[in-house]
Design a protein with these regions (language model features):
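Phosphate- and other anionic-substrate recognition elements at nucleic-acid/protein interfaces
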Residues: 1-163
Length: 163
C-alpha cells in the first residue's frame, strides 16, 4: 500500500506499507487497518485521499475493495475528510491524460519531486518494482491538491493543512 503525506504541495513523507501474507483475509484486513491507524496517529492528516476501487473478479481485487472502504471508514471515524478519486482522474491531473501508464505517472511525479527519481525503475522492469504504489499515493495527493487550487479554498475537501 502506497503512502504519501503532503502539506501545501511539499512532500513530507512517502513510502510503501507491506503486509505479510496471512492465511485469512480478515487477518490481512486487520493488518491494513492497524497500519492506517498508525499513520493517522503519526501524521494527523486533515484529508485522507483514497483511490476509487474497481470491481474485480478475483479474491485479491475483492480484498483491495474492502480495504479501501475500511480505510475511508477509519478516516471518517477520526474526523478526517475522505476524498475518493478515480484512477483516470488522478492520471489526467498528474500526467496530462487519463490513460497514462504507471511509468508515465511515476515520471511526472519524479519530475515534480526530484527526491523520488531514485525510485524510478530502469527500462521496462516497472512491474517488478513495489515503488509504483508509492508513486500512486503521491499522485493521489497531487491530484487532490490540484483540485483544491482550481476550485478555490472553500469549494474542495482537498485542502492539506498541518498533518
Amino acid at each position: 500500500m502506497g503512502v504519501a503525506v503532503l502539506e501545501n504541495g511539499s512532500l513530507l513523507y512517502h513510502g510503501v506499507e507491506t503486509f505479510r501474507k496471512l492465511p485469512s483475509p480478515q487477518d490481512r484486513l486487520k493488518q491494513g487497518r492497524a497500519a492506517v491507524a498508525r499513520l493517522i496517529r503519526d501524521f494527523r492528516p486533515a484529508v485522507l485521499v483514497v483511490e476509487k476501487t474497481f470491481i474485480g473478479k478475483n479474491r485479491n481485487a475483492a480484498l483491495l475493495n474492502v480495504l479501501g472502504d475500511e480505510i475511508a471508514a477509519l478516516g471518517r471515524r477520526h474526523g478526517i475528510a475522505v476524498v475518493s478519486l478515480a484512477p483516470n482522474t488522478v492520471k489526467k491531473a498528474v500526467a496530462g491524460y487519463g490513460w497514462a501508464t504507471k511509468a508515465e505517472v511515476a515520471n511526472a511525479i519524479a519530475a515534480r519531486y526530484p527526491e523520488l527519481k531514485a525510485y524510478l525503475p530502469p527500462g521496462r522492469k516497472w512491474k517488478q518494482q513495489r515503488h509504483y504504489n508509492m508513486f500512486d499515493a503521491v499522485a493521489l495527493g497531487v491530484a487532490c491538491l490540484n483540485a483544491s487550487k482550481s476550485r478555490g479554498p472553500h469549494n474542495s475537501h482537498c485542502q492539506i493543512r498541518a498533518p
